[in-house]
Amino acid sequence: CITEIESSKGTKLLIDLGHNLPDGESIAHDLYDEKSNIETLLDGVSHIFYSHYHSDHIGFESKVPDKIQQHIGSLSLKMIRNLREHMTYADSLKEEAYKSLSALERFDEYESNKRKVYGDISITTLPVSHSAIDAHMFFIECDGKTILHTGDFRDNGYNGKEMFEEIKSYISQSIDILITEGTLLSRNNPKMITEYQLKEKAEQLLNKYKYAFVLCSSMDADRLCSFFKASHDRDTKRR
């Protein structure tokens, strides 16, 4: 995921600089693994804003020259730094992980609901609900136009309803350009359950079986909360 925003005066920003995700068991290959390609992409760029810490949104941070300022949310920075530190234990990933950790030391941490100006482009960072905690969308003002870049989002998380109300409030301001994700566009009638429903199902299974083993992302805070609350509520009802 990479979006380029350039003003008529030449200010150029990127929203996300991610790597392709693996397809099943295969190794992920990306156009920007080639040094010449990423150098061409970054030519003239002054700032890069990351919406969240998933690898298809941040994956080339170590390849970015020091003169380009990289920005991410404070909690997202902690999460990606923790992930890269764990990668240093794998011999095949160690070298790149240390390069990434060095780059992360130079990151700027943006705050939610803050508007800042970079050259002649302004960006307001707005929190959204996603499986990555501290995910953000961006309200961008450039050349008299307004752009809403939603990043990845969902409405079935714990803060989904509030997030959609926020999006509606910005769309009501006559957005000129909407840039959004399309994760579910290729799926026919996807059946999604909410975190509340998942928590209830988990509690039922915990009541049914003596032992339960959970397999989920350790970086999905909503999901961890769902299983914690299911276990807590199950134990509370047994007292």
Can you annotate each of these PLM segments?
Residues H52:
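Conserved G/P- and acidic residue-centered "switch" motifs that form tight phosphate/ATP-binding loops
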Residues R239:
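A contiguous, basic/glycine-rich beta-loop/short-helix subdomain that forms a polymer-engagement track
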Residues C1-H47, D56-D222, S226, H232-D233:
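His/Asp/Glu-rich metal-coordinating catalytic cores
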